Structure formats: C-alpha cells, structure tokens
Curated annotation (Swiss-Prot):
It is found in: Nucleus. Component of the Mediator complex, a coactivator involved in the regulated transcription of nearly all RNA polymerase II-dependent genes. Mediator functions as a bridge to convey information from gene-specific regulatory proteins to the basal RNA polymerase II transcription machinery. Mediator is recruited to promoters by direct interactions with regulatory proteins and serves as a scaffold for the assembly of a functional preinitiation complex with RNA polymerase II and the general transcription factors. Component of the Mediator complex. It comes from Scheffersomyces stipitis (strain ATCC 58785 / CBS 6054 / NBRC 10063 / NRRL Y-11545) (Yeast). GO terms for cellular component: mediator complex. Transmembrane segments: none annotated. This is Mediator of RNA polymerase II transcription subunit 16.
Amino acid sequence: MARTASGATRPSDLISWSRNGFIAYACPVQHSKDNLLLTYLENVNGNSWKLAEPQSISVKLENNFLSELALVEWSYLSTDLAISDVYGNFYILLAGIGLLEPGSEKSTVNSDSSGAASTAAASQNSPSYELTSYNHMEMIYRDIINQDPALPVNPGAAIVSFSWLNIEKVQIINKPAALVTLENQNSSNSPFVYTYGVNQFQPHGVTHPISTKQACVALRQNGQFTLYFQGEHKVEYHKTSVALSDDIVIITKASIGFTNDKQIVVTAYDSVTRNISTYSVTVDWGFLVESAKRQKVDPHYHTPKEEHKTPKLNVTRISASIPVPTFLAAAEEEGMDMDKMDVDADSEDGNQPSYQIGSLASIDIISAGAEKDSSLDILISYTFEDGSGIASSTIYRYSLSEESELISSAFGELGVRKNVTAPANSPTVQTVTLQDKLIRSGTIQSITTALSDYFILLYYLDGHVDVVDRNSMKIVNNSDDTNLPPKTISSIFDVGFNFPKIDNSSNLIMAVSPNLTSVAYADFKGGSTRLNLKVFEKEKYLGISPKELFATSVGFAFRHAYACYTNTCSDDLVALIQTEIVRLQISLQKTITDKPHNIEMIIKKFVESIVSESHKAINFQLDAFNKESVDKLLSNPPLQKLLSLQLVLGELQDKNSIVSDIAWIVLNLRSTSFGIMFSLSSIYRQISKKKPTEDSLQDSITRGECIMSLVGNVKWLIDLMVYINQELLQLSYSKQDSSNSKLTIKNSIALPIILSKVPRLFLMYALSSIGRTHEILKKLHKDLSEASKLFTPMKESLNRYFTICNNSPLTLSLFENFLRECDALITKEQSIRLAGKEKGYSLKVEQKLVCQGELTEDMEQIGKILIDRHAVNINRDMKVSDLYFYDVDWLDIGVNKRSARTSKGLSETVIYPSSQLKPKMIPRLQYSDKECIDSLRKIIISVDMNQITGKTDTSRNGTTNHKAAIANDKIAKLRKCTRCRSVSLVADPLVFDAPSTIGLWTMVFQRTCICGNAWVNCVS
C-alpha cells in the first residue's frame, strides 16, 4: 500500500469503534496489502476475551490502487462507515447487509470472493440487499475526486473535517446514580443505596428529516463543504455542495459542529491567509421534509419525481480572526487584542517563563448536547514550549452568542454608560465569544467527545488521556476526591478507575470504547497489523470492604444501563467487570489465607450485587409481570441484555452453573416462544386467505419450510420439559436420603425455573403455543387431505413435526395443567408468606431465584410441596421409566452438563494481549469433534472447528445452502456469537428449495444472537 505523509490527519481520525462493538482502523503497517482492517472483542472460553484476528477490507480505486487512508468513522447508527483517503476520495460502506446478485435471489454473502469491499454503488441498476452479520460490508457510495494518483492531483480535495449528523430519534440517557443514605442503617446490608433515573430528549442538533435515514458532512481543504445524504428510500447516498468562501486558499485545520437550532457551524484555519473563520451552514432539505411527514402515515410513500426539490446548503460567515502569535512574551498576553482569540492569563504559580514559542494545534467544535439549553463550544488549542523546552497546551473555549447589530462597539459601550439598551426588535448578529480557557501540561494531539457528548477527551502525544466534564470543565479521571461513597456516579472514574498505562505511546492510533471503559490502540511503527485492547484499571478504592464493592457494582450497573438505553455493545464492560473480579480474588487470597470458602462467598456476593443493581438501574422488576404481559416480555430488549450479562458472569463460577444455566434457558424460552408464535401467525394468515381446495404447490413449499424451521426448537422445548420432570422426579426419590444423589434442592434448575415468575410465564406460554400449533396443524392436515391438496412438502414437514411431538415420554397437556396448578399454588402461598414483609421483599425473592438460582426458606417449603404434587401426578399419568431414561444430554444444562467438564472457572488472564498466543474459541453446545448444535435453530450442524475459531468474513463470505452442504459432505458456512460463543448457520437450511425471501422467523436474528450480541460470519 502506498503511503504519503499527511499532516492534516490526526491519529484519532484513523480508528473508529462502533456501538455494535466493531473497530475499524487504517492499517498501521506501511506497504501492506490492506489499507483498512476490522476487529472486535470476542469471548474465548467463557472466562477470557481476545481481539479477533484483523479482517481485511480493501478500499480500492478502479485501477486497484490502494491509497493511504485519512478518515475512518462509523455513523451514529453504527451501520455506515465513512472512509476517505489522502487524495480526497470518499467512500461509504454499509455493514450488516449482503448484496443480492442482479436477476436472482442469490446473495453475495454466500460466495467465495475476496475480502475486498464490493462496489454496489458502481452498478447501473439499483441493487437489492439482505440483512446479514455486521462484519460483512458492501460499498454503497463513492465520491472519487482523484482517480489516478500518478496523474496531477487536486491539492485542495483532501477532507480536513468530517462529521455524521445525528438521527431524528428520541434519545433516552440515564441520569447519574444518586446517593441516598438510609435512615435506619440496620434495614439493609448496606448503609446507603443509589437511585437511578432517565432523561428523555427530543432529537437534537441537525438531523436527516427521515428518522431511518442518515447523512454526513465533509469539509475539503479548498473550502468546499459537502452534505452526503440518503434519499427517502433505499440506502444509496447523494450529495450537494457549497463553497464556504471565495477567499479560502488552503484549510489545514477545521472542525464541524451542530447547534440545537439546526445550524451547522464550521470553524476553519487557512494556513495561507492565517485566518480563523467561523461559518454558519443551514440545510434546506427540500422534498425530504414533506416525505418524512408523509412516511409517518404511509411508510411506503414515494414523492412524485416532479415534486423532487433537491436539498441545498446556505452559508453565512459569523466571524474572522487571526491566531495568537507563535512567539509570545509573558507580559504581552495581558494586552492582547481580543480579535486574536486570546484572553488575559496570569500564571497559576506566578513563575511564568519570560517567553513561549507556540503554534495552533487544533480546532475542535463540541456540538450542543441533548438538553434544550445546551450550547455549542468552539475549542481553539495551542501548543507552547517555554525556554526550558517544557511543552504545555492551552485550550480557549468560545461560544456563539447573539448581539445587537450596532454601527460600532463604541456606541454599545456608550449606551451601557448612559443606561440605554437596544430595542427588543433590533436586528442581531451571531458572534464568537470567549468563555474560558484550560491550560494543561503536555502536547494535546486531538480532542473528541464521549458518552453522548457529556465528556470531552483530550488525547496527548505521550498517550495519556484527560476526561473533562462538559458542564464543569473539570478533569474527572484524575480527581483527588477520595470520599466514599461518591455522591453521584456518572462514569467509571467516579468509582476509582482510570485509563491504563500504555507503552511506546508516541506513534499511536487510539480509540476509546463507546462505553468509556477500555481503549484500543496500535503503534504505527510497531510493524504489526493487530490492535491491542486494555480495559480501565482501578487506581482508587482498592479495598475489599462491602462499601467499596457496592459502590463499584453501582458504577458497573450504571454503565450497563447506559449501554442498554443507547443500544451499545457492552462486551468491553463485561471484560472490565471480569478484570475487577480477578483483582478482587487476588487481593482476597493475600488477605484471607485460611478460609477459601469466604473468598468464594465474597466474590459470589459481588457478582450478585452487580446483576441486581443492573436490574435496578434500568428499572426492570422481575415481580412486576403477569400472564397478560408475556407478549411484551418476548420482545423486551432490557430482559435480553440482563440475561446476557448474567449468562457471562455466571460462567465464571467453576463449581456451580445454575446462574448461567437459568439465563441460558430463559433466553432460549424467549426465542423459541417467539419463533413458534411468529410461524403460527404466518401459517394462520396464509390459510385464512385461501380455501384448502385452492392450495398450490408453492403454498405447500412455503408452509412446509415454515414448519421445518420450528422442528429443532419444538424438540428443544419438549426435551426441556422432560428434563424439568426428570429433576422433579429425582428430587422426589432423594427427598428422604439425598446422600446418594448428585442433584439436590440447592443445585436444582427445575425449582428456580418453576418457582420464579418470569421463567414460569415463559414455560406456560411456550407450552400453550405448542398446543395451539398442534391443533392448527392437525386441522390443516385433515383439510388438505380431504381436498387432495396434501403435497409432498406439507406431508413431510407435518410428519416430522408430529413425530417429534409423539415420541416424547411426556404428555405436554398434562404437564401444562401441572404448571397451571403450580402457578395458582405459588401465587396463593406467596401472598400469605409475603404478608407483613418489607417493601421490595417480593422483588428480592424473585431476583434470588432468577439471578442466583437460590431458594429462600419460604420458597424452599413451596418447592417441596410442588415436588410432592408432581410425584403424585407423574405416577398416575405416565410411564416413569420412559421419562427417567430419556436422553436430554444435548441440552447441556444441569448438574451433569458436558461443558462443565471443560470449564476452568475464573481465569487470571481476562484479555489476551495481541502479542500472546491466544487459545482458540470453544463453541457453545459442541456436539462432537465435527458437529455443533445450531443455537438458534436447535439442529445439529457440521462444522469445521478451524472455521469457527479462525478468521472471519468481511464481505462476500458467509454461508452455503445447508442441504447442498450435507449432500456434498461439505462444511456449511457459519456465524458465531461474540459473547456467548453460540454457532449458527448464516442461511436457513431450506429443505424444499423455497426462495430465500420466504421470511421465516429466524430473519429477526440475522444480525444478533438470541443473547442479543452480534453474530460474525466465519470464513469458509
């Protein structure tokens, strides 16, 4: 790859971390065959993480020239990736979609072409796409300025500043956790608690009028300002441009920001004229404004071509100034002309050197925040070096203000002295006003924002980072405050964490995670294409007291809540939690040497505190649901996120898998129930439109595929019911003497699942769904047979479905009745036992059942009643031996689970360094050396372990047809989950050669696993 020096490129521009967890970055190695790479954090074995091998995304010109990149930035939705090279060529890649080949329904995701990003935008016809994993990308837009670098290039075409626009969507952001001291300290294990809340904000800044569409703006060195925007439908981008000024020669430093009154503000430095100018740009969105209104009523509305009014840009200059001199005597600073963007400044220590040699370092605009009264900040940074060679940075903060349009400022001063003010209706003009300044030692390299622009990040040349609170303008990650507990918790720094130390930091590209809990970086002179990742390190509150541990758990819960509200991948947060658990364990081992059981209990309580506070932080109450709210639970993202967190943290316990097993079971009950109801609705809609006599072969194929897609999940659900009955049966046998039984009430999964409200509701809902499906399919079979329309696809699929149901040793309707009896009994018993208990006790009981798998004394008594009732029912209604010896090992849950034999529990290595040989990923539900259970479809699939544990796909790689793969004894192409290590086929294994656009229930999980984390496509 050819590389050229680009002074305008800042290291932070060359790497971007998406909310979906994918890190895109310019290749840090010179003369590489790649210019853009992609990686992500992935779970290796349940207790350790690693950054995946970097995946190549080659962004090339038509002549295959691989130019040096100057910009890499994900959009707010984290689906669109903006790329620019040093010649000013601009590209947009779309992640998570596969290009369908023209004239067919075959996806390029299934092909075996190279890793280069495909160029959908080059096609003459409008392309069609399908959803797929986020590590597959298609190029959907190119703005080529300099096609052949061998020819004379346009010197002013390079992009010097870029920004994505916000989206037209209501934003929910959690308020800082606030400390509440309890009046009666004996009422809780902790003498204090934290309360949580949220703010809901209307769309702010400048946005595309259509809420599902995106736009971005770019400024080139020649002053050309461009808006790239999507149309009213489809994903393709268009552009419109305007020149900021005719006076611009060459812009070398600039920034773009947004106000809450729909202004785009641009501040730019022209290195020839030495002017710092600020401009206001407004967007006339044309026909898209009316289209946005119409689409709220009719999502498919298309504006007639004759009404297409193209969006355009309007520019107004706000101010023009010159920067401070490069040579500055200390005494001169007081007398500076304010037009030179300086302010009076006395040395803080009174020992200011006699002179400073400085230069303009950067211009950064911090957009207005979500609050209505939030305003935009313009930061002008200078680097100075005194006579001793010591470097410092001074950041001047300016804001936009409205002033009366007077003839001269002298008249304004005269009016103030005479107590005369301008009329209320007098015209006003915008101006740039100095607010304050911040002086820091060291050289600031770049400035960005974090956590919805609430914090400003200052990146220094030596690799360290300062975090500045946007409101107070105070440094928050190097605070001397040691008060515990903190009055408020708004970041991980409030509970003692800080940025990790990084070696060889002078040539870094670095990105901070969207959660502000870890950093990814690479050395431009290190010779490796791999990134390194480090989570934040604990610097304060290093003790092991309950007060310190609880405050830390609140910090983690608050960050997890932010990830939930903003739909941000929290894998690095989970890795940080695991790192803190390891630190705590090592500290306890040094302190408590003679009581290892106490160490285990403290860590267990710490994990329980993190999970329960995470529930509280998003106001998710396990005891607040009933039969009428199950439909909402099926599509409840917070529940999915909380169970996913519990699943991973539960796997750290090497002696007890109950916590992770319960989370895994409920996640699967959720997806299985959804799949059954989705498919049932599809079948019912289809048969309600036609009489059986009108049924066609195509109808039979479509319906047959729909039924076949359910077979694995129905089998899983039935076998889960069998396992629950097996546990209840064993508990009944071992009730008198548990010494010979590995299973006890303490380690049972069946009892917490039945006794807890949410899992029990899911169980009952799933059983009811299977019952309804069974009845509809029986009637459909009868009607089609009588009409002589029972074609082969329906015949075979119905036969397969009924065979699975009929081979069960359990009569589902009887077990459903038993669950209903249990529900009534538990509700009655709890109402009696909870009488007189403190407020919130019911929630604590539910959290113990679901999050810890533990039974309180009252629940244990109710559990024993259920065991006795079950023993009576089972002996009366079924053949016990058939149930007892029925094989359900493939579920991999409970005291005899297979994966427990390979689990090592907590590992001291939480994140493997890039330089260290990393272990291969151990897939969840591995069935044999060459087979795994598809976690989504619950079917056995052939796998190549090298494919799962090795490299992954960036574009035009993904899956083959499952049927063809089996027939030819090939390995079907796969995807894996970055968090729970699940494996699944990318494409549905269609049995009857149905079109791929059939719309099965699995399409809801095309990008995300059942645990809520992202899939990644694996290379063939």
